[in-house]
Structures are given as structure tokens and as C-alpha cells.
Amino acid sequence: MIRDICKDELFLARKAAPALPEDLPIAQDLLETLIAHKDGCVGMAANMIGVAKRIIAFESEDGYLVMFNPVILKKSGPYETEEGCLSLTGTRKTKRWQTIKVQWQNEKFQPRIKTFSGWTADIIKHELDHCDGIII
């Protein structure tokens, strides 16, 4: 189900709770909402659709990927950039990393670890900021 985009900064500033297997329908809604906004959006966190759970979805080189309970294990190559967000107006300056190593769970809640770089690393970090209640 495609959901409305949450623009409530007080809600967006809350840290997300860990995702559980019963949150799979939320992930499906998140993915459907992301695809519906694909012309202006490459990633979303569950709080962007009004659910404070640690779930992100984004477009990668291999298609769309959903991560449950993602965390950054390692990061390198800090730099400053400017980003926009469907939940916020305009663009804002923020710090990002050239390379990040991420641990997450897939839709079967099996652990995964992968290193991402460039644009994909930026997207993941932006969505993880949402999960951590950080507003760019």
C-alpha cells in the first residue's frame, strides 16, 4: 500500500525501534511508496511513512533493496555534500562517507554484511540518519 510521506519533524526526530518479522508488511508498504516516488526519490526509511521502525529501502545497481535493522560497522572518506529529502523542504548540507560497511538483516531476518561506496553509500547513510532521528 502506498502511504503518505510524513513531514512531521518531531516524529522524524525520534529514534526508530528495531524491526521484527511481524514488520514485513511495513517493509512492503515502504517499498511500494518508494517506487511510487521513484522520479524524485531513491531511498526511504520507515519513519518517512509514519512508522518508527528500523527499516530502509533504496534503489541500488541491482534493483531495490530492503534492509532491516541496518547499522554501519565501518566508514571512511568523509566529505561534505548537500541533499534533499521528500520529508523536508529544500536541500541541506551534511557529512557523508565515500565508503561504508553495513550489517543488516534481509526479509528472512538473516544477517548480511556488505561494503557500499559512492552514491549508494550516500543513500544508505541518509536513510540511517532517519532511523537514528537525525534530520539533515
Indicate where each model-derived feature is located.
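Positively charged
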Residues: 1-136
